[in-house]
Amino acid sequence: MSIKPNSFVIAEASKCVGCKACEIACFRAHSNGVKKPLTVGNIKTPIIPRIHVIKNEKFSVPVQCRQCEDAPCANACPIEAIKQEDNVMVVNEKACIGCKACVMACPFGAIEVRSESEDKPKIAYKCDLCKGQETQACVKICPKKALRLFDPIEEKKRRSIEAVCNLPEEF
Protein backbone atom coordinates (compact mmCIF):
# COMPACT_ATOMS: atom_id res chain seq x y z
CA MET A 1 0.00 0.00 0.00
CA SER A 2 1.25 3.42 -0.94
CA ILE A 3 1.42 6.38 1.42
CA LYS A 4 0.92 8.85 -1.45
CA PRO A 5 -2.60 8.80 -2.93
CA ASN A 6 -2.71 7.84 -6.59
CA SER A 7 -3.32 10.43 -9.28
CA PHE A 8 -5.99 9.73 -11.89
CA VAL A 9 -7.55 11.29 -14.97
CA ILE A 10 -10.79 13.12 -14.29
CA ALA A 11 -13.33 14.38 -16.81
CA GLU A 12 -15.55 17.46 -16.81
CA ALA A 13 -18.77 16.26 -18.44
CA SER A 14 -19.83 19.84 -19.18
CA LYS A 15 -16.83 20.24 -21.52
CA CYS A 16 -16.92 16.80 -23.21
CA VAL A 17 -18.42 16.80 -26.72
CA GLY A 18 -18.19 13.02 -27.18
CA CYS A 19 -15.68 13.15 -30.06
CA LYS A 20 -13.85 10.05 -28.75
CA ALA A 21 -10.45 11.50 -29.66
CA CYS A 22 -9.35 10.33 -26.21
CA GLU A 23 -10.22 6.72 -27.10
CA ILE A 24 -8.16 6.84 -30.30
CA ALA A 25 -5.23 8.55 -28.54
CA CYS A 26 -5.34 5.91 -25.79
CA PHE A 27 -5.35 3.09 -28.34
CA ARG A 28 -2.44 4.71 -30.18
CA ALA A 29 -0.45 5.17 -26.95
CA HIS A 30 -0.82 1.48 -26.16
CA SER A 31 -0.19 0.12 -29.67
CA ASN A 32 3.14 -1.42 -28.69
CA GLY A 33 5.60 0.59 -30.72
CA VAL A 34 3.67 0.94 -33.99
CA LYS A 35 5.65 3.58 -35.89
CA LYS A 36 3.46 4.23 -38.93
CA PRO A 37 0.39 6.48 -38.62
CA LEU A 38 -2.75 4.56 -37.68
CA THR A 39 -5.62 5.07 -40.10
CA VAL A 40 -8.86 3.25 -40.76
CA GLY A 41 -7.22 1.40 -43.65
CA ASN A 42 -4.17 0.01 -41.84
CA ILE A 43 -5.40 -1.02 -38.37
CA LYS A 44 -5.34 -4.81 -38.21
CA THR A 45 -6.37 -5.26 -34.57
CA PRO A 46 -9.53 -4.13 -32.79
CA ILE A 47 -9.32 -0.67 -31.25
CA ILE A 48 -9.13 -1.34 -27.52
CA PRO A 49 -8.93 1.92 -25.59
CA ARG A 50 -8.49 2.04 -21.82
CA ILE A 51 -10.90 4.97 -21.59
CA HIS A 52 -14.52 4.82 -22.77
CA VAL A 53 -16.79 7.67 -23.75
CA ILE A 54 -20.39 7.24 -22.68
CA LYS A 55 -22.70 9.35 -24.80
CA ASN A 56 -26.44 9.89 -24.88
CA GLU A 57 -28.80 12.68 -25.96
CA LYS A 58 -28.13 14.78 -22.85
CA PHE A 59 -24.44 14.36 -22.10
CA SER A 60 -21.19 12.62 -22.93
CA VAL A 61 -18.41 11.79 -20.51
CA PRO A 62 -15.26 9.67 -20.58
CA VAL A 63 -15.06 6.90 -18.00
CA GLN A 64 -11.64 5.75 -16.85
CA CYS A 65 -9.90 4.06 -13.95
CA ARG A 66 -9.73 6.06 -10.72
CA GLN A 67 -6.47 4.34 -9.70
CA CYS A 68 -7.92 3.35 -6.29
CA GLU A 69 -5.29 2.82 -3.59
CA ASP A 70 -7.24 -0.14 -2.15
CA ALA A 71 -8.46 -1.16 -5.59
CA PRO A 72 -11.50 -3.47 -5.67
CA CYS A 73 -10.32 -4.86 -9.03
CA ALA A 74 -6.93 -5.83 -7.57
CA ASN A 75 -8.53 -7.29 -4.45
CA ALA A 76 -10.89 -9.39 -6.59
CA CYS A 77 -8.19 -10.78 -8.90
CA PRO A 78 -7.63 -14.44 -7.93
CA ILE A 79 -4.09 -14.48 -9.33
CA GLU A 80 -3.01 -10.96 -8.28
CA ALA A 81 -2.50 -9.80 -11.88
CA ILE A 82 -3.49 -6.24 -10.92
CA LYS A 83 -0.92 -4.46 -8.78
CA GLN A 84 0.13 -0.99 -7.76
CA GLU A 85 3.40 0.13 -9.37
CA ASP A 86 4.70 3.66 -8.83
CA ASN A 87 1.29 4.89 -7.64
CA VAL A 88 -0.53 3.43 -10.67
CA MET A 89 -2.74 0.34 -10.70
CA VAL A 90 -1.58 -1.81 -13.63
CA VAL A 91 -2.65 -5.13 -15.14
CA ASN A 92 0.04 -7.73 -15.74
CA GLU A 93 -1.37 -8.76 -19.12
CA LYS A 94 0.86 -11.85 -19.29
CA ALA A 95 -0.55 -13.15 -15.98
CA CYS A 96 -4.22 -12.20 -16.52
CA ILE A 97 -6.52 -15.19 -17.07
CA GLY A 98 -9.54 -13.19 -18.25
CA CYS A 99 -11.84 -14.36 -15.45
CA LYS A 100 -13.69 -10.99 -15.26
CA ALA A 101 -13.60 -10.83 -11.45
CA CYS A 102 -12.04 -7.36 -11.77
CA VAL A 103 -14.81 -6.22 -14.11
CA MET A 104 -17.47 -7.18 -11.59
CA ALA A 105 -15.56 -5.56 -8.70
CA CYS A 106 -14.86 -2.15 -10.31
CA PRO A 107 -17.41 0.38 -9.04
CA PHE A 108 -16.65 2.75 -11.96
CA GLY A 109 -17.04 0.32 -14.88
CA ALA A 110 -13.52 1.25 -15.94
CA ILE A 111 -12.09 -2.19 -16.63
CA GLU A 112 -12.91 -4.48 -19.51
CA VAL A 113 -11.90 -7.97 -20.61
CA ARG A 114 -11.26 -8.32 -24.35
CA SER A 115 -9.04 -10.02 -26.87
CA GLU A 116 -6.96 -8.35 -29.58
CA SER A 117 -7.84 -11.20 -31.94
CA GLU A 118 -9.63 -14.55 -32.00
CA ASP A 119 -6.38 -16.48 -31.55
CA LYS A 120 -5.32 -14.51 -28.44
CA PRO A 121 -6.71 -14.99 -24.93
CA LYS A 122 -9.04 -12.46 -23.34
CA ILE A 123 -7.34 -10.20 -20.83
CA ALA A 124 -8.23 -7.20 -18.67
CA TYR A 125 -7.64 -3.69 -19.97
CA LYS A 126 -7.74 -0.55 -17.82
CA CYS A 127 -6.13 2.87 -17.71
CA ASP A 128 -2.50 2.80 -16.60
CA LEU A 129 -2.05 6.59 -16.94
CA CYS A 130 0.11 5.88 -20.02
CA LYS A 131 2.73 4.37 -17.72
CA GLY A 132 6.23 5.00 -19.01
CA GLN A 133 5.13 7.92 -21.18
CA GLU A 134 5.61 11.62 -20.53
CA THR A 135 1.91 12.60 -20.50
CA GLN A 136 -1.47 10.92 -20.62
CA ALA A 137 -2.50 10.62 -24.27
CA CYS A 138 -6.18 11.31 -23.58
CA VAL A 139 -5.44 14.50 -21.63
CA LYS A 140 -3.05 15.74 -24.29
CA ILE A 141 -5.42 15.16 -27.24
CA CYS A 142 -8.76 16.37 -25.83
CA PRO A 143 -9.81 19.34 -27.99
CA LYS A 144 -12.07 20.80 -25.28
CA LYS A 145 -9.67 20.20 -22.36
CA ALA A 146 -12.35 18.12 -20.64
CA LEU A 147 -9.74 15.75 -19.23
CA ARG A 148 -7.01 16.49 -16.72
CA LEU A 149 -4.70 14.61 -14.43
CA PHE A 150 -5.96 14.95 -10.86
CA ASP A 151 -3.18 14.77 -8.28
CA PRO A 152 -4.74 14.63 -4.77
CA ILE A 153 -1.61 16.00 -3.09
CA GLU A 154 -1.30 18.96 -5.49
CA GLU A 155 -5.04 19.64 -5.19
CA LYS A 156 -4.80 19.68 -1.40
CA LYS A 157 -1.88 22.14 -1.59
CA ARG A 158 -3.80 24.35 -4.03
CA ARG A 159 -6.90 24.41 -1.83
CA SER A 160 -4.82 25.16 1.28
CA ILE A 161 -3.16 28.12 -0.43
CA GLU A 162 -6.55 29.38 -1.63
CA ALA A 163 -7.97 29.07 1.89
CA VAL A 164 -5.07 31.01 3.42
CA CYS A 165 -5.27 33.70 0.75
CA ASN A 166 -9.00 34.14 1.39
CA LEU A 167 -8.70 34.53 5.17
CA PRO A 168 -10.29 37.67 6.61
CA GLU A 169 -7.75 40.40 7.35
CA GLU A 170 -8.55 40.39 11.07
CA PHE A 171 -7.41 36.77 11.32
Spans of model-derived segments:
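N-terminal signal-anchor transmembrane alpha helix
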Residues: 17, 21-28
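Short, flexible micro-motifs
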Residues: 21, 83, 112
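Residues that cap or initiate secondary-structure elements
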Residues: 15-17, 133
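Mid-length scaffold segments of soluble, non-membrane domains
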Residues: 83-91
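Flanking helices and flexible, charged tails adjoining ferredoxin-like Fe-S electron-transfer domains
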Residues: 1-6, 32-75, 93-171
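Short amphipathic
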Residues: 10-12
